[in-house]
Design a protein with these regions (language model features):
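C-terminal intramolecular chaperone/auto-processing assembly modules
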Residues: 18, 23, 58-68, 88-134
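Active-site-adjacent helical/loop segments in soluble small-molecule enzymes
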Residues: 44, 83
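Periplasmic N-terminal gating module of Gram-negative TonB-dependent outer-membrane receptors
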Residues: 24-38
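Small/polar residue-rich beta-strand/coil "junction" motifs that cap repeat-based extracellular fibers
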Residues: 1-25
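Phosphate-proximal small/polar/acidic motifs at interfaces that engage nucleotide phosphates
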Residues: 79
Length: 134
């Protein structure tokens, strides 16, 4: 199975296979607001290729160098090592030790966080309604 990928700005977009018929051991995932609140969003600049130990990356001097060289200026994102301490399942480590973040997994945690906040909001609205009706 494969998805479509294309590069735009500072990322790639994927169509991820999600058909229920391809999955098993399906359980609810409760990662949400508590974990999201621990994540630090950073502003950063990519190092130049000559500032990086390219041996950390499987195919040194290929797309990584092109991506880094083409991504000058400030960026917004996360640090894989920090994400790993909160959501280890969202970080992959190569055999050389380079880390990547699975942003789609964080997206699903955000969905759960929004659902949690919505439930809290609904409960507060109901409480206000009951207090005003007293």
């Amino acid at each position: 199975m494969s998805g479509q990928v294309y590069k735009r700005d500072n990322g790639a977009n994927w169509n991820q296979t999600s058909d229920e018929r391809l999955k098993k051991n399906i359980v609810d995932n409760n990662i949400g607001l508590a974990e999201i609140k621990q994540l630090r969003i950073t502003s950063f600049e990519y190092r130049k290729a000559d500032e990086i130990d390219m041996s950390l990356f499987p195919k040194a001097n290929d797309p990584l160098q092109v991506i880094i060289e083409g991504e000058e200026g400030p960026h917004t994102g996360v640090i894989a090592q920090e994400i790993e301490s909160v959501l280890p399942e969202c970080v992959k480590t190569s055999d050389k030790g380079a880390k990547t973040v699975q942003a789609d997994a964080i997206t699903w945690a955000l969905v759960n966080a929004v659902k949690e906040l919505s439930a809290k909001n609904d409960a507060l609205e109901e409480r206000i309604k009951n207090l005003e009706g007293s």
